[in-house]
Amino acid sequence: MPDTNSTINLSLSTRVTLAFFMSLVAFAIMLGNALVILAFVVDKNLRHRSSYFFLNLAISDFFVGVISIPLYIPHTLFEWDFGKEICVFWLTTDYLLCTASVYNIVLISYDRYLSVSNAVSYRTQHTGVLKIVTLMVAVWVLAFLVNGPMILVSESWKDEGSECEPGFFSEWYILAITSFLEFVIPVILVAYFNMNIYWSLWKRDHLSRCQSHPGLTAVSSNICGHSFRGRLSSRRSLSASTEVPASFHSERQRRKSSLMFSSRTKMNSNTIASKMGSFSQSDSVALHQREHVELLRARRLAKSLAILLGVFAVCWAPYSLFTIVLSFYSSATGPKSVWYRIAFWLQWFNSFVNPLLYPLCHKRFQKAFLKIFCIKKQPLPSQHSRSVSS
């Protein structure tokens, strides 16, 4: 945790000002994530696989604003001594919430990767509520196992009167392992899922361009095939009529009848081909438009995930690097500068940004928010109503 001794030299007015702005951040985190949770409760249309993971993320970020920051303000700015029990509770809860937030981001990225790379299998095999709840619980269990046991065990390593920070802060290798589990692996996984999403989109876009006019090709091939069959049948009828010995009159009648039959056959085949071609062309155009809409939706999704990855890296990389560097110093001489405190706060700032990056960019959540605030889109007046009013 940040060095409380560095706040002793601050004036009371400065501390009150800082406490006010920190409280605003905590309130903004609670408000933004509470809206996401409320939207999930109010709107039943949100209760599908991806929205459950958004809910899990919002819960972890919400309690960052409820527990982590409110306990941090009096301890750091006003030198409130927690005591051992409250200190252990705060550390365990704070690390649990922040790590769960990170792992929920990984889970959401993985879910989006499955929906883009294999949409059919995603829709048919991943709809069970039990599987979704199992994944949500697994996030919290893994998040606790990363830091929780070490915080409890290393509490006996600390000296009396030391700061409220984990006892393993003086062991660089433990910090390296926890940073690897909290930051490095999640960043690699989220980057991997995003790259695969972009690769799948590129392949789909390339395939869509190559098959931009599949209906025209099918029509031309059908028409050519039926025309060829019509000509072939006419030739066969003509050759058959010349080979049969008969009188000149009967032969001429036979030729006329064969020509009329071949022309009718050709006209019927062309008519059938044109009808089949029109059906195949309309079906292919509709299919192409549907694929184009899905491709645009997937592109927007990929862009939002790319922004998420960048924000996540910016919010977590500085603190992970600082903790490893500070582990080489003793707790008394560690240079915990203002940059360390900024890096520390960036983790909590990520909990404020998450509801803006995820649900607020999701159309279903936007509709749910409009429902919460009782905002309805006003329909445009029709021409009939305008004429009546005039």
Swiss-Prot record:
Disulphide linkage map: 87-164
Compartments, record wording: Cell membrane
Transmembrane segments: 20-40, 53-73, 88-108, 132-152, 173-193, 305-325, 342-362
Record topological domains on the Cytoplasmic side: 41-52, 109-131, 194-304, 363-390
Any GO MF annotation of the entry: histamine receptor activity
Glycosylation sites (chain numbering): 5, 9
Topological domain ranges for the Extracellular compartment: 1-19, 74-87, 153-172, 326-341
Membrane topology recorded in Swiss-Prot or TrEMBL: Multi-pass membrane protein
Induction description: Expression is either up-regulated or down-regulated upon activation of the lymphoid tissues and this regulation may depend on the presence of IL10/interleukin-10 or IL13/interleukin-13.
Tissue expression: Expressed primarily in the bone marrow and eosinophils. Shows preferential distribution in cells of immunological relevance such as T-cells, dendritic cells, monocytes, mast cells, neutrophils. Also expressed in a wide variety of peripheral tissues, including the heart, kidney, liver, lung, pancreas, skeletal muscle, prostate, small intestine, spleen, testis, colon, fetal liver and lymph node.
Keywords of the record: Cell membrane, Disulfide bond, G-protein coupled receptor, Glycoprotein, Membrane, Receptor, Transducer, Transmembrane, Transmembrane helix
GO cellular component, one term: plasma membrane
Entry's family note: Belongs to the G-protein coupled receptor 1 family.
Miscellaneous section: Does not bind diphenhydramine, loratadine, ranitidine, cimetidine and chlorpheniramine. Shows modest affinity for dimaprit, impromidine, clobenpropit, thioperamide, burimamide clozapine, immepip and imetit. The order of inhibitory activity was imetit > clobenpropit > burimamide > thioperamide. Clobenpropit behaves as a partial agonist, dimaprit and impromidine show some agonist activity while clozapine behaves as a full agonist. Thioperamide shows inverse agonism (enhances cAMP activity).
Function text: The H4 subclass of histamine receptors could mediate the histamine signals in peripheral tissues. Displays a significant level of constitutive activity (spontaneous activity in the absence of agonist).
Quaternary organization: Interacts with TSPAN4.
Name this protein carries in UniProt: Histamine H4 receptor
Protein's organism: Homo sapiens (Human)
